[in-house]
Amino acid sequence: MENKKKKVVVAFSGGLDTSYTVMYLAKEKGYEVYAACANTGGFSAEQLKTNEENAYKLGAVKYVTLDVTQEYYEKSLKYMVYGNVLRNGTYPISVSSERIFQALAIARYANEIGADAIAHGSTGAGNDQIRFDMTFLVLAPGVEIITLTRDSNLSRQQEIDYLNANGFFADFTKLKYSYNVGLWGTSICGGEILDSAQGLPETAYLKHCTKEGSEQLRLTFEKGELKAVNDETFDDPIKAIQKVEEIGAAYGIGRDMHVGDTIIGIKGRVGFEAAAPMLIIGAHRFLEKYTLSKWQQYWKDQVANWYGMFLHESQYLEPVMRDIEAMLQESQRNVNGTAILELRPLSFSTVGVESKDDLVKNKFGEYGETQKGWTADDAKGFIKVTSTALRAYYANHKDEKENI
């Protein structure tokens, strides 16, 4: 009786490491290899077609594209906008949020076809190995995890030589920079990134400033979700994000350098360009200042910071994340209206908002101008009561009062 071949799903990006993995497992191990590309919005149709062609050349018995772009938005990006999530106040968590949903898609596919193993191309030096492995351990228990790049410690040249020797040729030239292009921004690694004292030159960016002067950008939100760009309505939030990216990228907006702590405990630097995330989050946060109460903003910021941290730390499946999402969703019921931004080369500023839920417009008074909801005596009484705790403290600690 013929032995059944081991069925392996390779998380296939089309890059060097995953190309090597497909060929090695098919040729050297004799496995039945299924190449699966999980697309969260970063691959073009042309790239996906090339991936399919190459997967079969490398020895895969089947190639599939798992399009999880809408799921990525509905289960992650939407909440990151609600929470104005920027890691360390800077980075829109572009790559880490994508990886989780790529891993989820691969795990589901492996379960669907009854795979014996899942393989991915992560090295042992970064965060992605944790995001993939943890997801597979939880959602595909009992399925073997194969990581040739991490386990064999092969050099890029060794992998290229192996592929070439077996008749597969592609442009795997080691560029000065490596890029991860996604719906929610592009990360840039390598080159000057490795030197803490240097920034990135203009040539490192994929998108360049092609516009001069300035223009206004109007972003309209309904219950916290982006619905219109410059009064053009979008039923598909993905297309709305892409429209904002198109407008903002022409001004080179969204460039910055993120420095943070990796899950494995070392610090790392990454450059990025993310026009759409920075403009959408900037507009959304600005609108919330008008439409949410002080304590709504405060507590939402606290839980959103935790949400972003857990997302980055590969804790998306932690049950508390669903609780935080419920809180973020509820917080958006009055976040309605249009935020107006002023765009200029490499930067933007906030202008104003138009909203039926604008709390600045009220019948009680205008800041620094007039009050209609209280009298002068009311104000004096309020101030006196508010000062009670401090007056009581310093009445008992006169020595501290004298040293102020």
Q: Which sequence ranges carry the predicted segments?
A:
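Nucleotide-activated chemistry modules centered on ATP-dependent adenylation/adenylyltransferase
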Residues: E2-A11, L16-I404
